[in-house]
């Protein structure tokens, strides 16, 4: 249930989103923008316990976005500093911020058109913001309604079906490298992307699948190794890196052994990239930049009617938010 605060939105004070995505900005710049926005987010945090926080940071494989309530001057400063990094940011305010997030959650702004993973990624970003700060009502309203309508969009409308997915790319790459179905696969981390790839490959006939995680897992027909037991000298033909925190989870000496096994492939799904050492062989290391390039080449076109319908829903909720805030201000007079 959203809780209304005392905030207001006017010509100077906007509800907005600033960010970069796969469309305009390369992986290296997205990594830099993520670090910058993580620091910039601190300026949106409440200075006193009774104040409300005014930001949500969304970071995925293909986009980095900061949603917040601030003056135009603050957003302009952020945009300028991001451009100085060589990245190309976008900024949407008020009703356009609503329509943008609704399209993002609905999978209509994704590299993999109609993907479902983004719904969970947005929800986790929202829940993390709630844990860290008492969030302003307008941001509660924006994210709760976007998550609700994203789910409705998928259940009531037929999203475009596609085999142009990250798991499909992985299978394509394994076939190109002539990787046998008997190859041993190690998934570092039980992340959503690792799970989706593992179960996809299992259906394609790969049976020697191992997950490495902090805690014991309940896995059927798959093996597990705990973090303290993993060794890259073991004969894993393919290693999948599922999250950025892996970079700091193991000593550098362990990482340096990642290329010791001849012919090994490493897929790095993380942004920022998880591998802390230079690849010994570039054609054996595949990061999200290469994956994004392949997905972009095979990308399906957006369905205009579905995109427009999501935007219209976002606009209606923007108008609803303004009515709610106006009633709140009127009641306090």
Curated annotation (Swiss-Prot):
Biological processes, Gene Ontology terms: protoporphyrinogen IX biosynthetic process
UniProt cross-references to SUPFAM superfamilies, sorted A to Z: Glutamyl tRNA-reductase catalytic, N-terminal domain
Domain of life according to the entry: Bacteria
Protein's UniProt keywords contain Oxidoreductase: yes
Residue(s) at site: Important for activity: 100
Enzyme Commission designation: 1.2.1.70
Catalytic residues in the record: 61 (nucleophile)
NADP as UniProt keyword: yes
Residues that, per the record, bind substrate: 60-63, 110, 115-117, 121
Something else known: During catalysis, the active site Cys acts as a nucleophile attacking the alpha-carbonyl group of tRNA-bound glutamate with the formation of a thioester intermediate between enzyme and glutamate, and the concomitant release of tRNA(Glu). The thioester intermediate is finally reduced by direct hydride transfer from NADPH, to form the product GSA.
Name recorded for this polypeptide: Glutamyl-tRNA reductase
Organism encoding this protein: Chlamydia muridarum (strain MoPn / Nigg)
């Amino acid at each position: 249930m959203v809780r209304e605060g005392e905030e207001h939105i006017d010509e100077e004070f906007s509800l907005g989103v600033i960010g970069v995505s796969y469309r305009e900005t390369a992986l290296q710049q997205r990594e830099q923008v993520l670090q910058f926005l993580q620091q910039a987010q601190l300026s949106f945090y409440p200075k006193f316990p009774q104040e409300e926080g005014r930001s949500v940071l969304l970071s995925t494989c293909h986009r980095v976005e900061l949603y917040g309530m601030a003056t135009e001057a603050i957003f302009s400063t952020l945009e300028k500093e991001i451009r100085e990094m060589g990245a190309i940011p976008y900024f949407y305010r008020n009703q356009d911020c609503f329509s943008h997030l609704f399209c993002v959650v609905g999978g209509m702004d994704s590299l993999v058109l109609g993907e479902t993973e983004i719904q969970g990624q947005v929800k986790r970003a929202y829940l993390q913001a709630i844990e860290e700060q008492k969030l302003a009502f307008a941001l509660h309203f924006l994210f709760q309604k976007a998550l609700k309508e994203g789910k409705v969009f998928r259940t009531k409308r037929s999203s475009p079906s596609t085999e142009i997915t990250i798991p499909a790319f992985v299978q394509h790459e394994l076939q190109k490298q002539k990787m046998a179905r008997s190859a041993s696969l190690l998934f570092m981390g039980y992340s959503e992307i690792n799970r989706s790839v593992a179960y996809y490959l299992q259906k394609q006939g790969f049976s020697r699948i191992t997950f490495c995680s902090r805690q014991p897992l309940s896995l059927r027909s798959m093996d597990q190794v705990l973090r303290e037991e993993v060794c890259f000298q073991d004969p894993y033909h393919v290693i999948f890196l599922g999250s950025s925190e892996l970079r700091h989870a193991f000593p550098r000496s362990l990482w340096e052994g990642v290329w010791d096994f001849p012919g090994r492939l490493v897929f790095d799904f993380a942004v920022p990239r998880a591998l802390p050492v230079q690849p010994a062989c570039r054609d054996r290391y595949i990061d999200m930049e290469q994956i994004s390039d392949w997905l972009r080449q095979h990308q399906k076109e957006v369905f205009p009617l579905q995109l427009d319908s999501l935007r219209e829903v976002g606009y209606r909720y923007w108008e609803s938010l303004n009515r709610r805030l106006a009633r709140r201000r009127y009641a306090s007079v």
